[in-house]
């Protein structure tokens, strides 16, 4: 049975003071024992968060990492090995904001995915379609291509030590949310694509939904058979709301 997971992506939010306040809120949460919980703070605050959450069962990850696994001459980048040294266990790869705003392409993301795994970081691969692509009926084509790029380059076995997050771009920060059935349909297609290559990997990989998840809709979303938790954006900046989402995953 797949263990549920709830991950909070803080994006480019926070100051030392507000992060300290959020850490304090997280420390006081009663989290369900059967759920893996993680947060992805801005890189400047990773050490603060790791230190502040010591003794709490919350993993800390990075929002981005370099295409090379080891430190070297890549100005402005952070190597996966450095993130491991700092205490991170996870890293986001291919978030839609990286794909669409920063122009990251599948070939670059394949390298980031591989470099992370080479250092012992577990990548959380983000896939998803824009509103235009959904309205054109291309959702499964787009998601399948994003997923297939990793499979073709690294093999389906790479997902034995990874997480996949489906995040429809049109539902991120807009207040819009895919219906539970819409999300389930895409998650089922992702699992089927993996199963066509390796059924064991497909059964074991956790698929998270990301896109305006809140405590109010989490129970219904997480009740779908192929949705194993959530990648939470804005709601993760409120400790009480985030805790309620974690408890929904535990149910």
UniProtKB/Swiss-Prot annotation:
Enzyme Commission code(s) on record: 5.3.1.1
Q: Which Gene3D superfamilies match?
A: Aldolase class I (3.20.20.70)
GO BP terms: namely:
gluconeogenesis; glyceraldehyde-3-phosphate biosynthetic process; glycerol catabolic process; glycolytic process
Name the InterPro entries for this protein: Aldolase_TIM (IPR013785), TIM_sf (IPR035990), TrioseP_Isoase_bac/euk (IPR022896), Triosephosphate_isomerase (IPR000652), Triosephosphate_isomerase_AS (IPR020861)
Reported function? Involved in the gluconeogenesis. Catalyzes stereospecifically the conversion of dihydroxyacetone phosphate (DHAP) to D-glyceraldehyde-3-phosphate (G3P).
Say if the entry is tagged with keyword Isomerase: yes
* Residues that hold substrate according to the record: 9-11, 173, 212, 233-234
Pathway assigned to this chain's UniProt record: Carbohydrate biosynthesis; gluconeogenesis; Carbohydrate degradation; glycolysis; D-glyceraldehyde 3-phosphate from glycerone phosphate: step 1/1
The reaction(s) catalysed by this protein are: D-glyceraldehyde 3-phosphate = dihydroxyacetone phosphate
One GO CC annotation, please?
cytosol
Q: What Gene Ontology terms describe what this protein does at the molecular function level?
A: triose-phosphate isomerase activity
In the record, the note on similarity to other proteins reads: Belongs to the triosephosphate isomerase family.
Q: What is this protein called?
A: Triosephosphate isomerase
Sorted keywords for this record are: Cytoplasm, Gluconeogenesis, Glycolysis, Isomerase
Any idea which residues are catalytic in this one?
Answer: 95, 167
């Amino acid at each position: 049975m797949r263990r549920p997971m709830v991950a909070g992506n803080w994006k480019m939010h926070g100051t030392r003071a507000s992060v300290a306040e959020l850490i304090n809120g997280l420390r006081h949460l009663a989290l369900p024992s059967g759920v893996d919980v993680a947060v992805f703070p801005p890189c400047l605050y990773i050490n603060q968060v790791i230190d502040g959450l010591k003794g709490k069962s919350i993993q800390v990850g990075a929002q981005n990492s370099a295409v090379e696994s080891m430190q070297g001459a890549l100005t402005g980048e952070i190597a996966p090995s450095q993130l491991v040294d700092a205490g991170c266990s996870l890293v986001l790869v291919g978030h839609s904001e990286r794909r669409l705003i920063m122009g990251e392409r599948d070939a670059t993301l394949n390298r980031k995915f591989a470099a992370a795994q080479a250092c012992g970081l577990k990548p959380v691969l983000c896939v998803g379609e824009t509103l235009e692509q959904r309205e054109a009926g291309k959702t499964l084509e787009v998601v399948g291509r994003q997923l297939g790029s990793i499979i073709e380059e690294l093999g389906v076995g790479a997902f034995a030590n990874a997480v996949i997050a489906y995040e429809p771009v049109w539902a991120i920060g807009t207040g819009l949310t895919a219906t539970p059935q819409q999300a389930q349909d895409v998650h089922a297609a992702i699992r089927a694509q993996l199963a066509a290559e390796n059924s064991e990997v497909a059964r074991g990989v956790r698929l998270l939904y990301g896109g305006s998840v809140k405590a109010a809709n989490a129970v219904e979303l997480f009740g779908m058979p192929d949705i194993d938790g959530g990648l939470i954006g804005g709601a993760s900046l409120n400790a009480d709301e985030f805790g309620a989402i974690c408890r929904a995953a535990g149910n």
